[in-house]
Design a protein with these regions (language model features):
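Aromatic-rich, lipid-facing transmembrane alpha helices and their immediate juxtamembrane interface loops
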Residues: 10, 31-32, 36-306
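Charged/polar low-complexity intrinsically disordered segments
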Residues: 12-15, 25
């Protein structure tokens, strides 16, 4: 006799039979192994993200440098003491050192030569000529390594997929953008800024020559992108400003001049001249004169006294 509250034995057997029949109809639960899970197709959105990341991977250092520039200038626009600016300079030097490790040894040498050459141009342009002036009336410590970052930005551009695929057409597109900016600086922008940017337009032929005639055109074309961002943020945030009329030449200028990248091209071309001089000196003096070499030379010429 079944206990009260429990279904009849036949009913229980019927329930069990029905549940077993259900399992038999549905079959065993499917277990996905690692290979089956890997073979499952991902969503179209996942494929899109993966493809975009793969395409952007060769440009990560360029994106990093383009991101660091406005953050650096924003921080400099907020500081009030020189030691804070020195800290930004030290940070930028460290960043330049780490970023330059991605370049071959010869290019790293060019980057550091650019730092020295650009420092000389900065002292002349800002402190002597005075065509532009920094907020604290000095040459900030982050400016020399900043030139090195711009130069490195251009050097690494030659190995990017877009340059390798499209070649000089990339330079022609950038040159067209520079020409458009120069034209606007003479026509439309004066109505908004009150400045006629003749100085920027005069830099356009210099920039065009380097882009169209130089075998290192990717360097100079990429410099326009880096310096364009640098100058726009630097003048907008008040880190420096260009005088409305340049001293000595009395040429009107925008703030910033449109194709000032032409001036940067002159700086970077000077780096190549210095490099040739360095290699010429190496040919004349093939031996490296380190401290150990000098001491060995001195001690080898000293004979003991009798």
């Amino acid at each position: 006799m079944d206990p009260p509250g429990q279904p009849h034995r036949r009913a229980r057997n019927h329930q069990v039979t029905a549940s077993e029949r259900g399992r038999a109809q549905t079959g065993p639960a499917t277990k996905w192994g690692p290979h089956e899970l890997a073979a499952k197709p991902r969503s179209s959105w996942g494929f899109t993200i993966s493809a975009v990341l793969d395409r952007l991977k060769p440009y990560w250092l360029h994106a990093y440098l383009l991101t660091y520039t406005p953050l650096l200038l924003l921080a400099d626009s907020r500081i009030t003491a020189l030691w804070q600016q020195w800290a930004l300079g030290a940070l930028t030097f460290v960043l330049l050192y780490l970023a330059a490790l991605k370049a071959p040894k010869e290019q790293r040498m060019q980057v550091w030569i650019c730092v020295g050459v650009a420092t000389g141009f900065e002292i002349f342009g800002s402190l002597i000529w005075g065509v532009y002036r920094y907020r604290l009336h000095n040459v900030p410590l982050f400016v020399p390594p900043g030139h090195g970052l711009v130069y490195l930005f251009g050097l690494l551009a030659a190995r990017t997929p877009v340059v390798m695929r499209y070649g000089r057409r990339v330079g022609q597109v950038i040159l067209a953008g520079a020409g458009t900016w120069a034209l606007l600086g003479l026509t439309l922008l004066p109505l908004l800024t009150g400045r006629v940017d003749l100085q920027g337009a005069m830099c356009l032929p210099v920039f065009a020559w380097f882009v169209l005639r130089s075998p290192r055109w990717p360097l100079f074309a990429a410099i326009f992108i880096a310096t364009g961002e640098l100058e726009i943020f630097g003048t907008s945030l008040g880190n420096w400003y260009w005088l409305p009329v340049a001293p000595w030449t009395h040429i009107p200028s925008g703030n910033p001049p449109s194709v000032i990248a032409g001036g940067y091209c002159v700086i970077d071309a000077s780096v190549l001249l210095v490099m040739r001089a360095v290699f010429a000196l190496r040919a004349q003096f093939p031996y490296r004169l380190g401290l150990k070499t000098i001491m060995a030379s001195i001690t080898s010429t000293i004979s003991p006294r009798a």
